[in-house]
């Protein structure tokens, strides 16, 4: 897996599917949950996407605001496997 590819595909998923705005210029360090852009239920969708798109299973106890609030954090978690 290439980090840049993971970032691009995850960003597209978040913007298009969760934010309903494919053109949104999401910053890598922009807080999504604490910033009120997505809710905790969206984390489950991100977990399913990570498994489907990258073959990476993220356990429920890792799908937390502390671990997955920004695009950077999400990419780091996916890259960790």
Locations of the language-model features?
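Thiotemplate assembly-line natural product biosynthesis machinery
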Residues: 1-23, 76-81
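C-terminal structural segments of small proteins and small subunits
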Residues: 63-75
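Catalytic nucleophile serine of serine hydrolases
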Residues: 40
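Conserved catalytic core of two-component sensor histidine kinases
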Residues: 44
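Short, conserved alpha-helical segments within structured domains
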Residues: 6, 28-29, 67-70
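Phosphopantetheine carrier-protein modules
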Residues: 18-37, 54-64
């Amino acid at each position: 897996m290439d980090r840049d590819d993971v970032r691009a595909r995850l960003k597209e998923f978040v913007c298009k599917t969760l934010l309903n705005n494919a053109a949104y210029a999401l910053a890598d360090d922009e807080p999504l949950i604490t910033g009120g852009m997505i809710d905790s239920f969206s984390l489950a969708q991100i977990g399913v996407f990570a498994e489907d798109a990258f073959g990476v299973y993220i356990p429920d106890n890792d799908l937390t605001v502390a671990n997955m609030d920004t695009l950077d954090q999400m990419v780091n978690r996916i890259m960790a496997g």
